[in-house]
Swiss-Prot record:
Protein name according to UniProt: Phenylalanine--tRNA ligase alpha subunit
Assembly with partners or alone: Tetramer of two alpha and two beta subunits.
Main location: cytoplasm
Keywords: Aminoacyl-tRNA synthetase, ATP-binding, Cytoplasm, Ligase, Magnesium, Metal-binding, Nucleotide-binding, Protein biosynthesis
Classification lineage: Archaea, Methanobacteriati, Methanobacteriota, Thermococci, Thermococcales
Membrane-spanning segments: none
Length: 500
């Protein structure tokens, strides 16, 4: 074992005193308390000394108590005036009492029998009593004086003078905790001391002067302990979930996807439902499954030719379909709502025009009524995308989804389940296995129906998906509660591992 100068000095001091407090060691060695404690912890780790800690409850003055120790308690100051005047109106005490003290002084003087209180046409009159005239030193005065002199007093000692609750009730003092530390040398420490310890000051820094003069040969250079525990540093870093989103965005762009962007969180029902061939009487459009805007209530529809094609698809059908067979309402389509799924952006992009073949994606905030728990939020992020091309099939879609789950989320097991969406056929649900939560649904996907794509001006197959990217992040970041992604928990934010 290698001991430094401070450790040797502290060990020799403890050996001389056999048992000592930290304060005694500081006084004996003339080292500061931090250096002494550091040396004590090192010596204890080596088994050369034993450190004993005893916790004790203490009472210390508050800022108010410190003020009272200098200028006197409110009742003492009030009595000085009353002894001089015998009686005084409450307002006459304003020179010696603060506003908050004036409100309390009447009760204190009356409760302790120090003054009689009555009211006349001018206000409250305080008249000193015989007890007030002869008042001597009370327990509270003795306690205040003792605390002022010592700084801190044990609860046991102060309790012999006054009930601690009385001091705390008047906010004169508060309870704290003091740790008394004593150390004693062990047999191992005694053996080391008996062998002889050379106390030689160490040099912690090899300077150019020491090298040039050759004195480095004469001094003892303190070795660096690279295994010594140090204070953990928490450098600034990006929020873990933001890093995850940025990585996914970058990877998709590297794979040739084009990002779809939008400035607003609000959509008309036209883009959120109607353009996706979802009928206006569908239960998913009701308040139980979506949010609606109270004001403004309605937005604007796009150009008439697009609206008429969507109307035709709903009422009579397109691409050989019979449609939904009802009278489509433009008024219903104009209703505004927070976006319920990012697929609304896919519909906008298809109507705007796309490259064929082409790959598109977006990461957007969406809103749906739900019960908050560790896998569900009412406001969450969704990654939505589609691929358009002449020869695309459902199997291409399954391959993309599996790649998402395994490569991006880090899932080990993936399952596909048949599903239903009004705007895709066939449709599929993607689920992955989480070690803590079991099978977790990631999202839905399918081949856009021709009634939808033809109304939007697209003549080739389009495979599409909408995945809860928050759940992908749960897998990648190794968490079992989706709410942590948006948490202010400093411990998690500091300790979350960097990904990729």
């Amino acid at each position: 074992m290698t001991l430094g100068y401070n450790e040797k000095l502290v060990l020799l001091t403890i050996a001389k005193l056999e048992k000592a407090s930290v304060e005694e060691i500081v006084k004996e060695t003339r080292l500061d308390q931090v250096a002494v404690m550091r040396a004590i912890l090192t010596l204890e780790k080596e088994g050369l000394i034993k450190l004993h800690e005893r916790k004790e409850k203490i009472i210390v003055l508050t800022d108010i108590g410190k003020e009272y120790s200098k200028i006197g308690l409110p009742e003492i100051r009030a009595l000085r005036v009353l002894r001089e005047k015998k009686k005084a109106y409450l307002d006459e005490l304003k020179d010696v009492l603060r506003e908050d003290e004036l409100k309390a002084i009447v009760g204190i003087l009356r409760r302790e029998g120090l003054a009689n209180v009555r009211k006349d046409e001018k206000g409250l009159v305080l008249e000193i009593t015989e007890k007030g005239e002869k008042l001597g030193e009370r327990p509270i005065d003795i306690a205040l004086k003792l605390l002022s002199e010592k700084g801190e007093v044990s609860v046991d000692e102060i309790s012999r003078i006054i009930d601690v609750k009385d001091l705390k009730r008047r906010k004169i003092a508060r309870e704290d905790e003091r740790v008394e530390r004593t150390v004693e040398i062990t047999e191992k420490g005694k053996k080391l001391v008996s062998k002889g310890i050379e106390l030689k000051r160490e040099v912690t820094r090899l300077t150019p002067e020491l090298i040039a003069s050759g004195k480095w040969r004469e001094v003892e250079l303190k070795p660096f302990n690279i295994k010594a525990p140090v204070k953990r540093i928490y450098p600034g870093k990006k929020q873990p979930y933001r890093v995850f989103l940025d990585k996914i965005r970058r990877r998709l762009i590297e794979m040739g996807f084009i990002e779809m962007t939008v400035d607003s969180l609000i959509e008309t029902q036209f883009w959120n439902f109607d353009a996706l061939f979802q009928p206006q009487n569908h239960p998913a459009r009701e308040w139980t499954d979506t949010y609606q805007l109270k004001y403004p209530e309605k937005g604007y529809l796009p150009d008439e030719s697009l609206v008429s094609r969507v109307k035709e698809a709903h009422e009579r059908g397109l691409a050989g379909s019979r449609g939904w067979g009802y009278v489509w309402s433009p008024e219903r389509a104009m209703l505004l709502m927070p976006r319920a799924h990012a697929t609304a952006l896919s519909a906008r992009q298809l109507a705007k025009g796309i490259e064929i073949p082409g790959k598109y994606f977006t990461i957007q905030r969406v809103f749906r009524p739900d019960v908050l728990d560790r896998t569900h939020l009412i406001e969450f992020n969704q990654i939505d995308g589609f691929v358009a091309g002449e020869d695309l099939t459902f199997r291409h879609l399954l391959g993309i989804l599996k790649r998402f789950a395994i490569e991006i989320a880090g899932a080990k097991k993936v399952k596909f389940f048949p599903d239903y969406y009004p705007f895709t056929e066939p449709s599929v649900q993607l689920s992955a296995y989480h070690p803590e939560l079991g099978w977790v649904e990631f999202g839905g996907a399918g081949v856009f129906r021709e009634e939808m794509t033809e109304a939007l001006g697209i003549k080739v197959p389009v495979i599409a998906w909408g995945i809860g990217i928050d759940r992908l992040a749960m897998f990648k970041l190794g968490i079992d509660d989706i709410r942590y992604l948006f948490s202010y928990d400093l411990r998690w934010l500091r300790e979350a591992k960097l990904i990729w």
